[in-house]
Amino acid sequence: DEVEILIVNDGSTKDNTGEIADEYEKRYPGICRAIHQENGGHGEAVNSGLRNATGVFFKVVDSDDWVNEDAYREVLKTLRKFCHDNVTLDMLITNFVYEKQGAKRKKVMNYRTAIPKEELIDWSGVKMFMLGQYILMHSVIYRTEMLRECGLELPKHTFYVDNIFVYQPLPHVKTMYYLDVNFYRYFIGREDQSVNETV
């Protein structure tokens, strides 16, 4: 009952997304909520999620990605503590893992050299990022109200809106916390993915 899952069906016609979303809403009332809309692309799906979110924090998980169950428990425990202690946290950062189809090794994006672990900090506590080390949508959980206050609105029918989602709110972030867990699993390898070079 501490988690709200919004499943946005962005006008999907090629699969059973709508039916699956409705089934989850029936099976987990009060936790899962199905949102059906005309196709607006990835950005509009995120916008719908943000418009409908009632939770303190907001995390986007794309339909072909997933989160690690053990890390998920750690994330919830951390967020719960900030809420319980009545401490404002604008951004929680976690590691993410590239789950590349056919790859023998998994690349983990972590922030150990740039951000102190398990410490509430502001920007003065952040060190220089290394080349190839960057914050992506996969690594952030934002405070919902902060996203609304900064006027975040992603463009419709546009690829690569992830960067706007991550970087537009950053000047509004006053507090952050790095939890060193491999939370988000970013799947790469589907033929029709926008990140596929042939698409």
Predicted regions and their residues:
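Nucleotide-sugar donor-binding/catalytic module of glycosyltransferases
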Residues: 1-199
